[in-house]
Regions:
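Outer-membrane beta-barrel proteins
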Residues: 2-13, 23-233
Length: 233
């Protein structure tokens, strides 16, 4: 559940070309795409692939006005559910030196459509960034992946990112999930990550993940590390 599927090579080749759509205001659209292989898929500290590798990818369209929309995909392991497709749209703008991002994110699981419980979910979010720091608030307008009350589950996060060199970046993350209507399921997640820019859009990643959710959903919240190799277009 990401924020985060392997797009066909044909589609990726098309998406790496910037879109230049001009209207009367000479506004521009630009596109980007990404694909990666991960040792496992984690969502806010929780395992999504039962320790199995994940292939993930997506694409984005952004407008010079600040509007954007995109799609992100991954394999998952939830019983009969094997695919996650995320669709999002939002608006980014600046207030002085602070960057603000507001938007809507829909988590869609094609294998789960029509089943009970329905784990397809929707959240709205607001994220503020200043220098090396960012903080975000996410609010579910539906049930939290088929769990809890009709709406009201929330997630708060704070992040720090520091470029050690031109090719190495270190980042730290802390998040807090408040699961509405399910006693004892609130938890926090933490991570420290290292990113290695290999040039030409290639990157290596190493994430160390921990959380306080062992009592909520069992082994899905075990601590661990994730290794990744990705390509951006």
């Amino acid at each position: 559940m990401s924020n985060k599927f392997l797009t066909s090579v044909c589609c990726i080749s098309m998406l790496q070309l910037p879109l230049a759509i001009t209207n009367s205001a000479n506004a521009e659209w630009e596109s980007s795409a990404n694909v990666g292989v991960f040792s496992e898929y984690r969502f806010r500290g929780a395992k999504q692939t039962e320790d199995a590798p994940a292939i993930q990818g997506g694409f984005d369209l952004s407008h010079s006005s600040g509007l954007y929309l995109g799609n992100w995909n991954s394999n998952v392991e939830f019983g009969n559910t094997s695919i996650e497709m995320d669709f999002y749209a939002g608006y980014g703008f600046n207030i002085g030196d602070i960057s603000i991002d507001i938007g809507d994110l829909y988590y869609y699981y094609p294998d789960n459509s029509g089943q009970t419980p329905n784990i397809n979910s929707n959240e709205i979010y607001a994220i503020a960034s200043y220098g090396a720091f960012s903080a975000g608030y996410h609010y579910f307008t539906t049930e939290w992946f088929g769990v809890g009350d009709d709406s009201g589950t929330s997630y708060m996060q704070i992040n720090f990112e520091y470029p050690v060199s031109e090719s190495v970046t270190i980042s730290a993350h802390a998040g807090s999930s408040k699961i509405e209507g399910v006693n004892g399921s609130d938890y926090e997640d933490y991570s420290v990550s290292f990113g290695f820019d290999m040039g030409d859009g290639y990157a290596l990643g190493l994430d160390f993940i921990d959380n306080s959710g062992d009592g909520a959903v069992g082994s899905a919240f075990a601590s661990g590390a994730v290794v990744s190799f990705s390509k951006s277009f």
